Amino acid sequence: MVQFFKRPLLDIVHNHLIEYPTPVNIHYFWNFGFLAFICLAVQIITGIFLAIHYTPHVDLAFYSVEHIIRDVNYGWLLRYAHANGASIFFIIIYIHISRGLYYGSYVAPRHFTWVVGVFILLLIMATAFMGYVLPWGQISLWGATVITNLVSAVPLVGNSIVTWLWGGFSVDNATLNRFFSFHYLFPFIIVAIAFVHMAFLHQKGSGNPLGLIQPVDKISMYPYFIIKDAFGLVLFLLFFSLFVYFLPNLLGHPDNYIEANPIVTPNHIVPEWYFLPFYAILRSIPHKLGGVIAIIISILILAFLPWITNINVRSSLFRPLYKKLFWILFSIVLILGWIGGKPVEMPYVVIGQLITFLYFVYFLIFIPFLGRLEKFLVNYKTVY
């Protein structure tokens, strides 16, 4: 089998998936990049078959989704695998990012790998948002109205851009068609950029829990880590199957099973759970433009982490203070997610503003200050 992949045109598989030198001490948290690619493949395959039966028209979209579930052979499986696959995809992505934060994968020489990864995250979020509009339920319509209307906060040209996005003066048929087209296109762009992400990774080599560069004991990816990835894939499929077969509607919003009605506003408009922390940041800023800027910075600030961090030690195993701060950040994000799902009323507004403030303080003050403090307290030359 190995000899087969040494042939011309297939040697890229041999070099990057079979003989690729991998640090011997990586553990299962390094499996989530592979699982993310599996999730992306599942979303693309199920999405293609769903698009065959879906009708992007405001009068037919809701019923076409019902038709897929009720009348198409295994349509229920396609729909639930795609809908729950999005949630599982974000779980995998967030764990992948958390591992990078905990073990310092964003520090040079892998900083460009990290930046490309943040760009992929932005594309995934945009794709998921447009996909959530397609079932044309109540939350689909009103969520699209609320989020796209945020662009109107841009001075001078905001309202014109919103009208252009909508294709009219409200979220309507033109909007649905545009979102469907881009939702179909974006996953293929994500695949292309994911290969760029892998190219940067393989240029410098995979990281490891110790955060060391050289010397590191390495072994070939096949068969050792391929088997490890396969075991992780089995566990992932079991977890995924739990939602698809037994809890298919657990992660959905009940109001989105009601056909979109532009006259009736839902009592509580909330995005999918994976957007809730960022939605809480948006709502915590009273000024509309300020909220838009805050939510953009809250994501882009991850891309600037390699330059905000002023210490070359990567792994939190050698940074006890940073390790504690990481779990503080983890708690901050969980609280933001909880606040994002609550109504805009006291005391949730004040709590959201406080936690949003702590989120930005963590990245803009704690991280740079901690680097200087650790340099002062510890001689890190011995780590290498």
From Swiss-Prot:
GO CC aspect terms: mitochondrial inner membrane; respiratory chain complex III
Record has Transmembrane helix as a keyword: yes
Transmembrane segments: 32-52, 76-98, 113-133, 179-199, 225-245, 289-309, 321-341, 348-368
Cofactor(s) listed in the protein's UniProt record: heme b
Bridged cysteine pairs (disulfide): none
CDD domains: cytochrome_b_C (cd00290), Cytochrome_b_N (cd00284)
Keyword Hydrolase tagged: no
Cellular location(s): Mitochondrion inner membrane
Biological process (GO), any one: mitochondrial electron transport, ubiquinol to cytochrome c
GO function terms (MF aspect): metal ion binding; ubiquinol-cytochrome-c reductase activity
Protein name: Cytochrome b
Source organism per UniProt: Cyanidium caldarium (Red alga)
Gene that specifies this protein: MT-CYB
